[in-house]
Design a protein with these regions (language model features):
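Nucleotide phosphate-binding/pyrophosphate-handling subdomain across enzymes
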Residues: 16-33
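Active-site-proximal beta-alpha core segment in soluble small-molecule metabolic enzymes
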Residues: 2, 7-9, 30-208
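Active-site anion/phosphate-binding pocket segments in diverse small-molecule metabolic enzymes
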Residues: 1-12, 16, 24, 67, ...
Length: 300
């Protein structure tokens, strides 16, 4: 969504508040990993990244390597790419991909074949310093990740590839925003069942699972990192189990074009998805959206 003739205002102080608020909740020994995929949820990734640096956040995660390229040379971020990097058999890395992986980017690895192909592509590209990888475990989301029983074998493959270095193991909650759901404790146990033995071999292994809701409602000091998403921007991850004390950081302002006075029962906008319940004063502004997402948010 692009606001035409409108202004998107980002509150630095509110973002700082949300960062500090979540950090206090998870404990000062747990690292915050800011989710800044999709242009920082539309807030502007370059500006948000700079504010996060000021706030002391040292980790960020994005969806794809393409998103990571924009941030790869920022020296204060460790950047985790959540989507597995897919390389075809015999495939090579582009120049931009090479530059990103020479920066602070970490890659998600979910199977042996992908690990071997990535290592080969790095070898062909002349990498001398290993790229750090995080292994994603399918703890019950049933979407992306290696099954728990296969983690040990995958780790052995990574250990035998000099172009790769295991840095972390992680999973995603299926119901992280519903703290009392049965799957929350079950999936935490699954992750610990594979990560705890690995910590004996890799003492500095980073283990992470929680999203915004999970970080607030589930305290687990044994986890090293929490991936905070929309809570940083002051948005609620769940309406049924809200995170207390968040402050929305964004505001859109725009000039008013027209003002109408209409009686109760007046339909407004495309499809009349809003109907006045009382005599109302309505205005139209210059902030307009033309994308599909904007159509969902704006009533015409």
């Amino acid at each position: 969504m692009i606001a035409q003739n409108g202004t998107l205002e980002i509150s630095r102080s509110r973002l700082m508040h949300n960062v500090a608020h979540m950090q206090r909740r998870v404990g000062m020994n747990v690292k915050l990993c800011a989710t800044i995929k999709a242009d920082a949820y539309g807030h502007g990734v370059a500006y948000i990244a700079e504010l996060l640096r000021e706030a002391g956040v040292q980790w960020a995660c994005v969806y794809s390597l393409e998103e990571a390229m924009e941030l790869a040379q920022l020296p204060w971020f460790g950047i985790l790419v959540l989507s597995p990097l897919v390389i075809a058999e015999g495939g090579e890395l582009s120049v931009d991909e090479r530059e990103a992986l020479r920066g602070q980017v970490r890659v998600n690895v979910t199977d042996k074949e992908s690990a071997i192909r990535l290592a080969k592509a790095l070898e062909v590209a002349g990498f001398e310093v290993p790229v750090k990888v995080h292994v994603q475990v399918d703890a019950g989301l049933t979407r992306v990740g290696v099954e728990p029983w296969a983690v040990e074998e995958l780790v052995e493959v990574i250990a035998g590839l000099k172009q790769l270095e295991l840095e972390g193991v992680f999973a995603h909650f299926s119901h992280g925003d519903v703290p009392k759901h049965d799957t929350v404790s079950e999936q935490l146990k699954v992750l610990h069942s594979v990560a705890d033995p690995l910590r004996k071999r890799y003492p500095r292994l980073m283990v992470h699972l929680q999203n915004s809701g999970g970080a607030w409602h589930l305290e687990d000091p044994s986890l090293d990192l929490v991936r905070i998403g929309i809570a940083l921007y002051g948005l609620q991850p769940s309406t049924s189990d809200p995170v207390e004390g968040l402050l929305p950081i964004a505001r859109i302002t725009a000039p008013i074009l027209t003002i109408h006075h209409r009686p109760a029962g007046t339909g407004v906008g495309y499809g009349h998805t809003f109907v006045t319940k009382r005599p109302s004063r309505l205005c139209s502004s210059r902030a307009r959206g033309s994308s599909p997402s904007a159509r969902c948010r704006y009533r015409g």
